[in-house]
Amino acid sequence: MSINEVFRSFKAQPVNQLAKIQAERPIWFVMVGAAIFLILSAIFYFQLFLAMAPCEKCVYIRFSQSCIVIAGLIILINPRNNILKTLGLLLAWYAMIQGWIWSFELMKIHDAAHMVVDESMDFFAAAGDAAGSACSTEPRFPLGLPLDKWLPFEFAPTGGCGEDDWALFGLNMAHYCMIAYATFMVCLAPLTLGWFASFMTDRRNTIVYQTR
């Protein structure tokens, strides 16, 4: 099937095409790969190469990205299994929404810290006080998971929120995290719709078959 034929069939029956896409593994490999890329970028580029110590919100964001990976792996076991798909989608939506919230909170802290810096002659004292007052070195992960003890290099906060000055095209790390989560959600929404449509169709077919 050519690309033009794919687009024509998608235009004619978008929900059916989404149902087919979400029932196969490739799209979920993409989701897992994207989340792994974000995690590895944070660890190897920002933490190791740029020597930027992760803050409390940063490790929470890593946790949410790890949840996206786990959600994708659950679905990849069998994308056609409704129980696995439900568990995976619930975890993925939780991780994306919560990750966006943590990123938004980090952005607000970053803005507040740098606002204090702009009004102070002492950059390090002002940024440290503003960021440190909003962050903790003892994170509280969901379900009480001691990830900072199990994997301290990845999940133990050693920096203050908002202390970094990294920016690209005028946007800081928190902004890009918000964009990443928003992109995840925009992509997951039609896949969720496709799965739900497929689930309801299968259910109706089962009911019709049982009533014959």
From Swiss-Prot:
Keyword Cell inner membrane set for record: yes
Membrane topology qualifier: Multi-pass membrane protein
Keyword DNA damage part of the UniProt annotation: no
Gene Ontology annotations for the cellular component aspect, listed alphabetically: plasma membrane
Record Pfam families: DsbB
Gene Ontology BP, a term: protein folding
Entry keyword set: Cell inner membrane, Cell membrane, Disulfide bond, Electron transport, Membrane, Oxidoreductase, Redox-active center, Transmembrane, Transmembrane helix, Transport
GO molecular function, one term: protein-disulfide reductase activity
Parts of the chain that traverse the membrane: 27-49, 59-76, 83-102, 177-199
InterPro entries linked to this entry: DiS_bond_form_DsbB/BdbC, DsbB, DsbB-like_sf
Disulfide bond positions: C55-C58, C135-C161
Main location: membrane
Cellular location(s): Cell inner membrane
Function description: Required for disulfide bond formation in some proteins. Part of a redox system composed of DsbI and DsbL that mediates formation of an essential disulfide bond in AssT.
Family statement: Belongs to the DsbB family. DsbI subfamily.
Assembly, per entry: Interacts with DsbL.
Identification of the protein by name: Putative protein-disulfide oxidoreductase DsbI
Organism annotation: Shewanella oneidensis (strain ATCC 700550 / JCM 31522 / CIP 106686 / LMG 19005 / NCIMB 14063 / MR-1)
